Amino acid sequence: MKKEHIFWTSICLLLGLVPAPVSSAAEEDEEFTNITDIKPPLQKPTHSFCAMKVDDGPCRAYIKRFFFNILTHQCEEFIYGGCEGNENRFESLEECKEKCARDYPKMTTKLTFQKGKPDFCFLEEDPGICRGYITRYFYNNQSKQCERFKYGGCLGNLNNFESLEECKNTCENPTSDFQVDDHRTQLNTVNNTLINQPTKAPRRWAFHGPSWCLPPADRGLCQANEIRFFYNAIIGKCRPFKYSGCGGNENNFTSKKACITACKKGFIPKSIKGGLIKTKRKKKKQPVKITYVETFVKKT
């Protein structure tokens, strides 16, 4: 009887020791899981003000400014009230990038126009943050048709077309390759608008650069007449336009050099079944009408 009691006592002691390794293993697994869930710290910016939150101030002006977003590592547009605020506020996109964004890897949008719809055709309708009332067209992915909407005049996204035909050609019935006609751009002296005159020579463009280089020039909503530059994605060149002083979009540069640096290197032109002859541009003294021409010829 005594031996039997000792035997069962030993069994109980052994069974009592079994859960200990199991719980230890669970703790080790739990500790390992916690370690893998830890996110690396954000990179510290060169200037402390680059990490400040956007501050439009207490006043009620409507001034376009730029700030550095520490979460996305990109310079973004905001509307400044005109007084107070903080140092994370820049007059131009280039100044913001120079002060805050140069220490971070460039985050670019890689777009390749191939067979099928471009990615931006699947974006939802976006009127932007401004208060304009401009008729535009977007591709509705639910109805599979291009539809009309009212655009505010600034920001928004690339699913935004000036004509129904342009929307249909791009998103409803895309061609095998996204082709853009070579254009002759003229400055209209009456209302300072850009008129594109297509020629017969098509070109293909492969874009590997920032998405803000793609929208057309946007004068904005105010009454000023500041000379700015925008990247014309149709002809692959930086062109001047008159900016009103507020609103507009990000395709807006204070100098031609800044425009070329940001956008021009992103486009790679390829001629179709022919050689490309680059014609020299002659500078004219008359600021009234500026014409730029590129000619295509077939190889013999």
UniProtKB/Swiss-Prot annotation:
Disulfide bond positions: C50-C100, C59-C83, C75-C96, C121-C171, C130-C154, C146-C167, C213-C263, C222-C246, C238-C259
Protein's UniProt name: Tissue factor pathway inhibitor
Function: Inhibits factor X (X(a)) directly and, in a Xa-dependent way, inhibits VIIa/tissue factor activity, presumably by forming a quaternary Xa/LACI/VIIa/TF complex. It possesses an antithrombotic action and also the ability to associate with lipoproteins in plasma.
Gene3D superfamilies: Pancreatic trypsin inhibitor Kunitz domain (4.10.410.10)
Leader sequence residues: 1-24
Listed GO biological process terms: blood coagulation
Compartments where located: Secreted
